[in-house]
Amino acid sequence: MSKVMETKQQVVTEIADKLRASKSTIVVDYRGLTVSEATELRKQLREAGVEFKVYKNSLTRRAAESAEMAELNEFLTGPNAIAFSNEDVVAPAKVLNDFAKDHEALEIKAGVIEGKLVTLDEVKAIATLPSREGLLSMLLSVLQAPIRNLALATKAVADQKEEQGA
């Protein structure tokens, strides 16, 4: 096998592994972004723990078929970049959606969330969800509320008895 074929096969394997391992994968069309805008987008994604790469569509198609995500192939036309997140399902959708609001040149095409193909509308809906940390803080506040209310009620009763005794 030629050196070029080996290199392409390694890239296909790399993409397929990333598709299988990622909890959230978003495909975007970055045509029209300036270099500074693309750099800013990469920085924001990196800070969110998201990997952002540009691959040839033909190699990405082979990798998607290898990873049993062939339905993604219909969105692989034109210049595409792919955002992979192994940690947070919401992070790539949130960062890309927020960036696309300010920069019309960035077009979200589709994504794969936990192995399921999602459309542009679903990606936008996912982007509105709070992050994992936000959900955990909401859960903790819900769990603490009854205890806090009990403590306040007990304190109010104690204060009332103290006033009656004085």
From Swiss-Prot:
UniProt-recorded name of the protein: Large ribosomal subunit protein uL10
Keyword Cytoplasm: no
Annotated NCBIfam families: PRK00099.1-1
Pfam families associated with the record: Ribosomal_L10
GO CC entries: cytosolic large ribosomal subunit
HAMAP family (alphabetical): Ribosomal_uL10 (MF_00362)
Function in brief: Forms part of the ribosomal stalk, playing a central role in the interaction of the ribosome with GTP-bound translation factors.
UniProt entry tagged with the keyword Coiled coil: no
Molecular function as annotated in GO: large ribosomal subunit rRNA binding; structural constituent of ribosome
Subunit-level organization: Part of the ribosomal stalk of the 50S ribosomal subunit. The N-terminus interacts with L11 and the large rRNA to form the base of the stalk. The C-terminus forms an elongated spine to which L12 dimers bind in a sequential fashion forming a multimeric L10(L12)X complex.
PROSITE patterns reported for this sequence: RIBOSOMAL_L10
GO biological process, one term: translation
InterPro entries associated with the record: Ribosomal_uL10, Ribosomal_uL10-like_sf, Ribosomal_uL10_bac, Ribosomal_uL10_bac_type, Ribosomal_uL10_CS_bac
Family matches, as CDD domains: Ribosomal_L10
Family recorded in the similarity comment: Belongs to the universal ribosomal protein uL10 family.
Keyword terms, alphabetized: Ribonucleoprotein, Ribosomal protein, RNA-binding, rRNA-binding
